[in-house]
Design a protein with these regions (language model features):
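Short beta-strand-centered segments at strand-helix junctions
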Residues: 1-5
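Short, basic amphipathic alpha-helical segments that act as recognition/interaction helices
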Residues: 10, 16-27
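Structured interaction and signal-relay segments at domain junctions
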Residues: 30-32, 38-105
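Juxtadomain coupling helices with adjacent low-complexity linkers
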Residues: 31-43, 73-82, 90, 125-158
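A short beta-strand signature within small-molecule sensing/ligand-binding domains used
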Residues: 105-117
Length: 158
């Protein structure tokens, strides 16, 4: 059972079902890039041999390299939400506590998280993911996540 909290000012999509009932769904601009995000994740996986993902502010929308069953379309953790709100690229450090990607699965943790910012708003995040107690990400993964997040932000502006 999963509920997305709708805050004041969040865009909504409104649908009707076959019985005429109204369905309100939180609109995700980065979700519009779903196929594109999946291709980016696959490219990042091939380049780094790691697990790469893209999420919007609520759920993981694309993933490649593993953990698809455990994380795809699962809600992001509160800690990941805080990282996105902070608007800075995060990198897990040796000896630091692990930050889970999703509240639904504590096995997979954030190695690098780069927020996607478009027109001043946080839209989501580009992630490199590892299992708990894995070594920290390299500078290459850090810069790749940062570059892809900047690129996605620019794509959403056009």
């Amino acid at each position: 059972y999963h509920v997305n909290v709708i805050s004041n000012g969040d865009p909504l999509e409104i649908f009707t079902d076959k019985d005429g009932e109204l369905i309100f769904k939180k609109y995700s601009p980065i979700g519009e890039l779903g196929d594109f995000a999946a291709q980016i994740c696959d490219s990042l996986r091939k380049t780094t041999d790691g697990i790469a993902a893209v999420c919007d502010r609520d759920t993981v929308i694309a993933i490649a390299g593993g953990a698809k069953k455990e994380l795809l379309e699962k809600p992001v953790s509160a800690q990941l939400g805080e990282i996105m709100a902070g608007r800075s690229v995060y990198r897990h450090s040796t000896g630091g506590s692990s930050t889970p990607v999703s509240a639904a699965d504590e096995k997979y943790c954030i190695s690098v998280a780069a927020p996607v910012i478009s027109e001043g708003d946080v839209m989501g995040c580009v992630l490199f993911i590892t299992e708990k107690n894995s070594p920290p990400a390299s500078e290459v993964e850090f810069k790749l996540a940062q570059t892809v997040a900047n690129f996605l932000g620019k794509q959403m502006e056009s």
